[in-house]
Amino acid sequence: MFVMLISVTDKSIHGKNMNGYLKRILNARVYDVAIETPLEVAQNLSARTGNTILLKREDMQPVFSFKLRGAYNKMAQLTQEQLKRGVITASAGNHAQGVALSAQKLGCKAVIVMPTTTPQVKIEAVKHFGKRSVEIVLHGDSYNDAYDHA
């Protein structure tokens, strides 16, 4: 296992130009809703591997997961017309919470389809983060059932 950190001054990785990729990262609007989380040294894992292993503490995000970053970044790129129409997703967990918080922050309606087997704690978290922006639909016994329904 290795962790690679790329600084803004790096020009390439594995022979590929990273300027466009880094520009997209630096211009992402995720910090409208996400927090900048620290890197922490994983002492035991570093000792076992003989390398310095850093962990990105995404558990410190408002939804306790990195999934908020992708959901918000995608939704923040939608046009006003698209946001007005709303979004729909299928998820039984962290992605649902990320979409819910993103919808609430962007003033967008979101339908989140979750399997009927979703733990109540996850359903309540989605309600909490989405407030009145979210409609939860429980459908099917599995993620695939929920996905097909969405």
Where are these regions (language model features)?
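PLP-dependent amino-acid enzyme catalytic core
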Residues: 3-150
